[in-house]
């Protein structure tokens, strides 16, 4: 069996076109453009690349982005003050904190200061709780983007045995909630799960997010499985690979996401979708 590629780059571009059309329609009716505020603390080069990509995506669809760069010496109180200003700024529909933060800062405290209706990353406890209660509002971007991809390819998730490898707050945990909403039977594992191979061999849908290059060998993949690889890892030779050994998994899976070009573009476009959703809600209540 040769897998069909789930092309996140293609799907994300199609979604951007629809968002741009909606933004133009809103502005032609006299409304302002949606606004996204991004807060970058320190000078992490990888974080700077991610912020640049998000700014570019905003420009492509007509959103206005506001970048606030704080020094690595910034205190939590200084960040709280900035967030409070943005919470009360009617030009701003979405606020994101570019992660990771410097170690001295308490990530949970910082994220909790964002108004839940502007939390377009979907990490505020209120939004996570809504997802857990089966009534999501602003949903975490990567997990929502994966669901969008699967739906785009008309993959019926109902009653599939889904195995999630990785239990982070950013991917694994919200992904589990999304899969339960879709009607999957879900097994949640991580890098240190005993007999991990057995779980993966029985997975109809496998979602891997551990941040370790080629961690899952293709020989573990069930014939005809759907493989979603969230990992993005740079090898010593400069090549970018995922958490699943692609070439061998490609020969066994029915569907598979490439790295790069699979989940990554969907995370960014989902951030834009969430910002437009927050914008629509802003105008609805006013």
Swiss-Prot record:
GO terms for cellular component: cytosol. PANTHER family: C-1-TETRAHYDROFOLATE SYNTHASE, CYTOPLASMIC (PTHR48099:SF5), C-1-TETRAHYDROFOLATE SYNTHASE, CYTOPLASMIC-RELATED (PTHR48099). Keywords: Amino-acid biosynthesis, Histidine biosynthesis, Hydrolase, Methionine biosynthesis, Multifunctional enzyme, NADP, One-carbon metabolism, Oxidoreductase, Purine biosynthesis. Pathway: One-carbon metabolism; tetrahydrofolate interconversion. PROSITE patterns: THF_DHG_CYH_2. SUPFAM superfamilies: Aminoacid dehydrogenase-like, N-terminal domain, NAD(P)-binding Rossmann-fold domains. It comes from Blochmanniella pennsylvanica (strain BPEN). The lineage of its organism: Bacteria, Pseudomonadati, Pseudomonadota, Gammaproteobacteria, Enterobacterales. This is Bifunctional protein FolD. It catalyses: (6R)-5,10-methylene-5,6,7,8-tetrahydrofolate + NADP(+) = (6R)-5,10-methenyltetrahydrofolate + NADPH; (6R)-5,10-methenyltetrahydrofolate + H2O = (6R)-10-formyltetrahydrofolate + H(+). CDD domains: NAD_bind_m-THF_DH_Cyclohyd.
């Amino acid at each position: 069996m040769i897998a069909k590629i789930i092309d996140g780059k293609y799907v994300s571009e199609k979604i951007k076109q629809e968002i741009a059309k909606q933004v133009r329609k809103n502005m032609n009716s006299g409304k302002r453009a949606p606004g996204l505020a991004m807060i970058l603390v320190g000078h992490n080069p990888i974080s700077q690349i991610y912020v640049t990509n998000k700014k570019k995506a905003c420009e492509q669809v007509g959103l206005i982005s506001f970048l606030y760069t704080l020094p690595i010496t910034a205190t939590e109180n200084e960040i709280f003050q900035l967030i409070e200003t943005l919470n009360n700024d009617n030009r701003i529909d979405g606020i994101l904190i570019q992660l990771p933060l410097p170690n001295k800062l308490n990530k949970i405290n910082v994220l909790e200061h964002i108004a839940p209706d502007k939390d377009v990353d979907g990490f505020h406890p209120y939004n996570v709780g809504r997802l857990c209660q089966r009534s999501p509002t602003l949903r975490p971007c990567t997990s929502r983007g994966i669901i969008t991809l699967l739906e785009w390819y008309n993959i019926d998730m109902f009653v599939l045995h889904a195995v999630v490898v990785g239990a982070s707050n950013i991917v694994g945990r919200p992904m589990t909630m999304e899969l339960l909403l879709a009607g999957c039977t879900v097994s949640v594992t991580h890098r240190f799960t005993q007999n991990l191979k057995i779980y993966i061999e029985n997975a109809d849908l496998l979602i891997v997010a551990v941040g370790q290059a080629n961690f899952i060998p293709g020989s573990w993949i069930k014939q005809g499985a759907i493989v979603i690889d969230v990992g993005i890892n740079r090898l010593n030779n400069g090549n970018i690979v995922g958490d699943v050994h692609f070439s061998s998994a490609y020969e066994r899976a029915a569907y598979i996401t490439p790295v790069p070009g699979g989940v990554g573009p969907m995370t960014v476009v989902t951030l834009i979708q969430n910002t437009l959703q927050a914008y629509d809600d802003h105008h609805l209540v006013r």
